[in-house]
Amino acid sequence: MSAPADNQARDEPLLVARQLSKWYGRQLGCRDVSFELYPGEVLAIVGESGSGKTTLLQLLSCQLAADAGEALYRTRDGALRDLAQLGEAERRFLFRTDWGYVHQDPALGLRMSISAGGNVGERLMAVGWRRYGAIRSAAAEWLDRVEIDRSRIDDPPRTYSGGMRQRLQIARNLVTNPRLVFMDEPTGGLDASVQARLLDLLRGLVGELHLAAVIVTHDLAVARLLSHRIMVMKGGEAIEQGLTDQVLDDPHAPYTQLLVSSILPA
């Protein structure tokens, strides 16, 4: 994916990781991971199972506490805040307003027993919307944007296909115009045709909404299509990072070379 159109030199980073580290007892989760993410930029974190990419995503999204290092987020007032120093109420506020989180399993990010419109509307109510007509109208518009027929607005997601559930989860996350979205294997477990449709949708929305995103994926084709920058992880460490096309077309680390040659078509 080509770089964002905006000149990043004029922006300040939205999310900063400085030597983030996490252990599970004696087992390393990740160690000394550092990067900066700018507004409108998408970072893909790739690597095989157990490489540390999911641990890193959980650290960045405040689901785990780091053992060393820090994760900093630039709030809307321009302050760069240490996420570890935020109270629980402040973190919940971030997830309601500034952040989204797209799970690999949509059931983790949706309420399966309430309607699709209710799932989207809940996010709006959490940021202060109160008029039923406006909430329902916004939910219907977002169903359109994620290519779900409006006639399904009153159906619960348990009646949806896997691809539809994932698109609904995306609508639920993006309806409040977040600045940063975390995605954990967003296309995992989907058939190839469904995955391709979802990728096209995600790519369009990320560009249209000028979203910053951190995407964990094992699929280098997904990373190439969606991300501006890529980080390759192995054994809990970031062994290579840079512009996605440059890293995938000319990998320097031996492990990255192996990963690219074994997964990407010649």
Describe the predicted segments one by one:
Residues 61:
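Helix-to-loop junction immediately C-terminal to a conserved catalytic motif
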Residues 79-100, 118, 126, 247-251:
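ABC ATPase NBD coupling module
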Residues 46-48:
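The feature captures the beta-strand-to-loop junction immediately N-terminal to the Walker
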Residues 134-151:
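Conserved ABC ATPase "signature" region
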Residues 156-160, 164:
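Conserved ABC ATPase signature
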